[in-house]
Amino acid sequence: MKLCLTFLLVLMILASVTGEKSSKHTLSRAARVKNRGPSFCKADEKPCKYHADCCNCCLGGICKPSTSWIGCSTNVFLTR
């Protein structure tokens, strides 16, 4: 009987450590946050100082979408 209870306890701990039961909850929460978007970023065409100020990129002091395949680049040839 003790062996059976110990085995069940080990299974419960193992499931909680590996995230078996919480994976669906975590994924659904991540999807909701992604759809809502960050609440602290500025939309396109707003003034900015850093890339982190914008939802996309800060180029020339204005939030703009990235036009390069490598992300927010300030190189003239990559931002056209």
Curated annotation (Swiss-Prot):
Signal sequence, renumbered to the chain: 1-19
Disulfide bonding pattern of the chain: C41-C55, C48-C58, C54-C63, C57-C72
Stored Pfam families: Toxin_19 (PF08088)
Record's keyword annotation contains Transferase: no
Tissue note: Expressed by the venom duct.
Top-level division of the source organism's lineage: Eukaryota
GO cellular component: extracellular region
Keywords: Cleavage on pair of basic residues, D-amino acid, Disulfide bond, Hydroxylation, Ion channel impairing toxin, Neurotoxin, Secreted, Signal, Toxin, Voltage-gated sodium channel impairing toxin
Modified residues (4-hydroxyproline): P38, P47, P65
Compartments where located: Secreted
Propeptide: 20-35, 80
Modifications made to the protein after synthesis: The natural D-Leu form of the peptide is more potent than the synthetic L-Leu form.
Chain positions found as D-leucine: L78
Entry annotated with the keyword Secreted: yes
InterPro entries hit by this protein: Conotoxin-I_CS (IPR013141), Toxin_19 (IPR012624)
Cited PROSITE patterns: I_CONOTOXIN
GO molecular function: sodium channel regulator activity; toxin activity
Written domain comment of the UniProt record: The cysteine framework is XI (C-C-CC-CC-C-C).
Family membership noted in the UniProt record: Belongs to the conotoxin I1 superfamily.
Entry function: Iota-conotoxins bind to voltage-gated sodium channels (Nav) and act as agonists by shifting the voltage-dependence of activation to more hyperpolarized levels. Causes circular motion, convulsions, copious urination, rigid paralysis and death upon intracranial injection into mice. Causes unbalanced swimming, swimming in diagonal and vertical motion and death, when injected intraperitoneally into goldfish. L-Leu and D-Leu forms are active on both nerve and muscle.
Protein name: Iota-conotoxin-like r11c
Annotated source species: Conus radiatus (Rayed cone)
